[in-house]
Amino acid sequence: MKAEAKDAAALAPMVKRLWPEHDLQALVRILTEYIASPESAVFACREGDRFVGAALCCLRHDYVEGCQTSPVGYLEGIYMEEDCRKTGLARTLLGQCEQWAKEMGCREFASDCELTNETSLAFHLSLGFTEENRIICFKKTL
């Protein structure tokens, strides 16, 4: 299902397990912005009255590794509760993101993960993604 603004607060604690560096209020704000923007979407799945998974996707107009077109649909994050992994629900969420991207005019869909996140790498490869590059990012304070 496509998440609505009223779902942001209920989704935030689960999404915090994906991005623990963010506080809950920041995640509610991020989710609310993603839900409201025509350039992004949040899809979620429930079991009974609890959310068990969520996927955040957006349109990227900048360069995306390995892609030749613009905009590119981009999976910013996907999370499934432990007891719902390997059930096909994440595949369904990804499919909803991909369909949304097609409807937005995209011909390519991309994602990323940390170099050390072997679980995410296996997930992406199992769902038809191909690895395009490995990078280490740098910064310095000016």
Regions found by a protein language model. Give the residues of each.
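Conserved GNAT acetyl-CoA-binding A-motif
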Residues: 94, 101-113
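Conserved acetyl-CoA binding element of GNAT-fold acetyltransferases
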Residues: 68-82, 136-137
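Conserved acetyl-CoA-binding loop-helix of GNAT-fold acetyltransferases
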Residues: 80, 86-99, 122-126
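Conserved beta-strand in the GNAT
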Residues: 44, 50-59, 74, 79
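A short beta-loop-alpha structural element at the N-terminal edge
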Residues: 1-11
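Conserved beta-strand-loop-alpha-helix junction that forms the acyl-donor binding cleft
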Residues: 110-120, 139
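Active-site rim helix/loop that mediates acceptor-substrate recognition in acyltransferases
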Residues: 23-46, 56
